[in-house]
Amino acid sequence: MAPAASSAPRLLRAAMLLLLLVAAGRRAAGAPVVNELRCQCLQTLQGIHLKNIQSVKVTTPGPHCDQTEVIATLKTGQEVCLNPAAPMVKKIIDKMLN
C-alpha cells in the first residue's frame, strides 16, 4: 500500500504542472507580441527607391510609441523603417497611400 500512497502526490504534482502549462499556453496565444508594446523603429532610413517598395504602413503615435513610424515592406519581404520627417519619405508616403 505504501507505493500507491507515494505515487499519489507525484501524480497530483504532474497534473498540476500540466494544468499550469496548458493555462500558460493559452495566455501566450492571446498575448500581444512584445514589439507591439514599444516603438518598432529604433533606426530609420532617410529614403529608399520607390521601385523597391511593395507597401508602406504608417503608425500614428499612441500608447505604445510616442512617434509616428513609417515601415516599408520591400519587394524582397524585408521591412525597413523610414524617417517620417525626411522629404523623400513624405513623397513615398504620398505616392503609396494616395
UniProtKB/Swiss-Prot annotation:
Pfam families: IL8 (PF00048). Residues 1-29 form the signal peptide. Gene3D superfamilies: 2.40.50.40. GO terms for biological process: immune response; inflammatory response. InterPro entries: Chemokine_b/g/d, Chemokine_CXC, Chemokine_CXC_CS, Chemokine_IL8-like_dom, CXC_Chemokine_domain, Interleukin_8-like_sf. Keywords: Cytokine, Disulfide bond, Growth factor, Inflammatory response, Secreted, Signal. GO terms for cellular component: extracellular space. Disulfide bonds join C39-C65, C41-C81. It is found in: Secreted. It comes from the Eukaryota. One of its GO terms (molecular function) is growth factor activity. Its main location: secreted. Belongs to the intercrine alpha (chemokine CxC) family. PANTHER family: GROWTH-REGULATED ALPHA PROTEIN (PTHR12015:SF192), SMALL INDUCIBLE CYTOKINE A (PTHR12015). This is Growth-regulated protein homolog gamma.
